[in-house]
Amino acid sequence: MKILILNGPNLNLQGRRDVAVYGSTAFEEYLTRLRAVFPDVGLDCFQSNVEGELIDALHRSEGRYDGVVFNAGGYTHTSVALRDAVAAIATPVVEVHISSILAREEFRHEIGRASCRERVLRLV
């Protein structure tokens, strides 16, 4: 099984940015844990602060990955283009968030939900 972990804007700063909300664990630490727990799963990662690059990565996932784990960062709340890209591909996509977006501002709640298969909230 091959999974693409796709991270959006500012997630390159995970572990250093707004630690009270997002925690102090760097993405590399999460990845090390995931690889230890799921040694038989091929995990590839891609992070971009650019919306179009995330859309391109979603499009390229078809036929290459069995699924995508996607944290769109702030684009979760604003990007219809990313929502449409997820809806346009056959690859299953699971939306994840480090913080509990449902406990935060209303505008953070819904835009990606309609097209993802599942949602995982608050990893901190």
What are the language-model segments listed below?
Residues A87-R104:
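Short, acidic/small-residue loops that bind anionic groups at enzyme active sites
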Residues P9-L11, G73-T76, S99-I101:
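Short glycine-rich anion-binding loops that position phosphate/pyrophosphate groups of nucleotides
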Residues D44-G52:
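Short beta->alpha junction loops
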Residues G112-A114, E118-V124:
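Single conserved hydrophobic/aromatic residue that forms the stacking wall/gate
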